Structures are given as C-alpha cells and as structure tokens.
C-alpha cells in the first residue's frame, strides 16, 4: 500500500537562505521524512523512518538521502 503523503505534516524547516534547505514532515504515528533541497545542484532527496524523528532531525546534515521512490 503506497504511503499517503497527505498524512505527513510539516514540522520543522531550516532557513531558506542557507543551502541546502531541510524540511521535516511527521505523521501522528511518528513516521517521518526529511526533504533536502540543494539549490546549487537543483536536486531534492529524502530520508525517512518509522520513529526517532527528533533524533534524525538533529542529525539531518549527517544522514543519507535518496530519491523519493527509494525511501517512501
């Protein structure tokens, strides 16, 4: 069953004047994904998990990011 991205709500974001920009989304169940927008390379990549959003948000600049179809 595909994920319903409408279930994810924007929770955190970084300053959009700094590259890259990170956007953190969470469901009420605690599932999450972080979108990394790199304006220099004009790319968007994603990291996702089922728990530990706060920890991963804190490590957002150190975790691995992938194409959306690889993580969601």
How does the language model describe each region?
Residues 1-72:
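Viral virion structural and adsorption modules
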């Amino acid at each position: 069953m595909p994920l319903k991205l409408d279930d994810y709500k924007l929770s955190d974001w970084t300053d959009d004047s700094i590259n890259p920009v990170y956007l953190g989304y969470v469901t009420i169940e605690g599932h999450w994904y972080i979108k990394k927008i790199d304006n220099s390379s004009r790319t968007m990549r994603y990291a996702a998990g089922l728990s530990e959003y706060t920890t991963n948000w804190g490590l957002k600049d150190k975790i691995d990011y992938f194409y959306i179809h690889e993580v969601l």
